[in-house]
A protein has these predicted regions:
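Bacterial N-terminal signal peptides that target proteins for export
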Residues: 2-17
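Bacterial N-terminal signal peptides
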Residues: 16-25
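Hydrophobic membrane-targeting alpha-helices
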Residues: 25-28, 32, 131
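Catalytic loop of the DD-peptidase/beta-lactamase superfamily, centered on the K-T-G motif
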Residues: 29-96, 226, 238, 274-443
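Active-site-proximal loop and beta-strand segments within enzyme catalytic domains
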Residues: 46-49, 99-213
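Short, solvent-exposed loop/helix junctions and linker helices
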Residues: 56, 60-64, 113-118, 154, ...
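Hydrophobic (often cysteine-bearing) scaffold residues that line and stabilize catalytic clefts
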Residues: 62, 66, 116, 120, ...
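Short, surface-exposed loop or secondary-structure junction motifs
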Residues: 155-351
């Protein structure tokens, strides 16, 4: 445990507007890599393929729809952050709004790192799958193989990845069972609490009986990465992903980063204080930018880091008890449509930070929004997917990690979303449909 007192967080850090050229200028996706004895890739800097051309008509169609959605939904609902929409690796639409501190003069720019909350799980999951790909673990191993004191039979690495472990959520049980909130919780504390206080825990389900989204799973997976590699989670993520991919504005938060990490704010603009759960990582605590997340998307899409077999494991649906389009893979949410199309995505929410990272694999398109002043509008990005291709179907509000907790926030978007969103959807779809008809006539 770490005392929460006498820690200074969120000193002002000023970011200046730097807008380099489009990402990806080199031509190969086939850079080979080898792994050391701990499963860590010995990777030099990797190169992304050159983005393929998008027609001027298609670019204009998508951009016009994005501008309308941004102006009438995001910007009007207190958005403070970053948005990027890309097609074939080309940035079609990109906007930065607001300041890192409220009030402040540190304008948010392409180099401003924001907390992506549970979108961090995509990195944790792919780190585990990297170790599996390199032969350092079996994802069907029980977690207790690596932590013998862990007394939950049947909980496998796979069930942690796909949220079918049956474990309770540390974000609830620690406080409910009397954790001293003047002490920061660590990942080790989460594990030890599960082991030593098992008899007092409620809501423990049989492993693999059903899907329950649970941050505990990813706090434990971060410990597993450290156990197998002998490296701190942050170092492994940095060396395996951030450095090779030149994600220069990405980092895993630790207390040493307290001076540079931007704070988050509630929908009224009031700062969210640093809390006793805020030092746990694996489930959250990656800070990055929309441009760095585009690099991450492109590296995954062109098999720069992973084999097809590994990606098939990640993107497979594992919770099929109930019919419907929504499902969860290994670290990824997904919408699967009857026409065969699939949206691979993850949302995030922690305090005032929220994010949406949406990957339309069939259309080589990416939609990324990050903010540090809470607005539910960030979760309405599915409309942009339907603009790129109407086959993605009707628009509804996205899932986030703790829907019950999210419902308790009385932000203006929740009160007016139904009317505003319906009007915006209609207007945006009209513009997009008109542009699409014009494009088809020309071709």
């Amino acid at each position: 445990m770490i005392p929460i007192f006498n820690i200074t967080f969120y000193r002002p850090v000023y970011h200046y507007l730097v807008l380099p050229g489009l990402i990806g200028i080199v031509t190969s996706c086939n850079t080979a890599s080898t792994a050391d004895k701990n499963g860590v890739d010995n990777l030099s800097v990797l190169t992304l393929p050159k983005p393929t051309t998008v027609s001027p008509e298609e670019t204009a169609r998508i951009r016009n729809a994005c501008v309308l959605w941004y102006d009438t939904v995001l910007k009007q609902k207190g958005f403070n952050g970053e948005i990027l929409v890309a097609k074939n690796g080309n940035i079609i639409f990109e906007q930065y709004n607001g300041t890192g501190h409220l009030p402040g003069t540190d304008t948010i720019s392409a180099t401003t790192s924001l907390h992506i909350a549970s979108v961090s799980k995509t990195f944790t999951a792919m780190a585990i799958l990297k170790l599996w790909q390199n032969g350092k673990l079996n994802i069907d191993d029980e977690f207790s193989k690596y932590f013998p004191a862990f007394n939950y039979s049947g909980v496998t690495i796979r069930s942690l990845l796909n949220h079918r472990s049956g474990l309770p959520n540390y974000t609830h049980f620690l406080e409910n069972l009397g954790w001293d909130k003047t002490r920061l919780v660590t990942n080790e504390d989460v594990l030890n609490f599960l082991i030593t206080r098992k008899a007092e825990l409620i809501d423990i389900a049989a492993p693999n009986s059903h899907f329950t989204y649970c941050n505990t799973n990813y706090a434990l997976l971060a410990l597993l990465i450290e156990k197998i590699t002998g490296k701190k989670y942050a170092d492994f993520i940095n060396q395996t992903f951030f450095i090779p991919l030149q994600m220069k504005n990405s980092y895993v938060f630790s207390l040493a980063d307290s001076a540079k990490a931007l704070p988050s704010y509630n929908w009224k603009g009031k700062i969210e204080p640093f809390g006793f759960l805020d030092a746990v990582y694996g489930d959250k605590n990656i800070y990055t930018t929309v441009r760095d997340l585009l690099i991450w998307d492109r590296a995954l899409s062109c098999n720069l880091l992973f084999t097809n077999e590994t990606l098939e494991q990640a993107y497979a649906p594992y919770s099929n008890e109930k019919p419907g389009t929504r499902n969860y893979g290994l670290g990824w949410r997904m919408n699967i449509y009857p026409n065969g199309k699939k949206i691979i995505y993850h949302n995030g929410w922690w305090h005032g930070s929220n994010a949406s990272f949406k990957r339309l694999l069939n259309d080589s398109a990416t939609i990324i929004v990050i903010g540090n002043k809470f607005t539910r509008a960030i979760y309405h990005t599915k409309i942009l997917a339907s603009i790129i291709d109407s086959a993605y179907g009707p628009v509804d509000e996205e899932e986030t990690e703790t829907q019950k907790d999210l419902a308790a926030i009385k932000d203006p978007v929740s009160k007016t979303a139904s009317v505003t969103n319906k009007n915006t959807v209609k207007a945006t779809e009209v513009i997009a449909a008109k542009s699409l008809r014009q494009h088809k006539k020309k071709n």
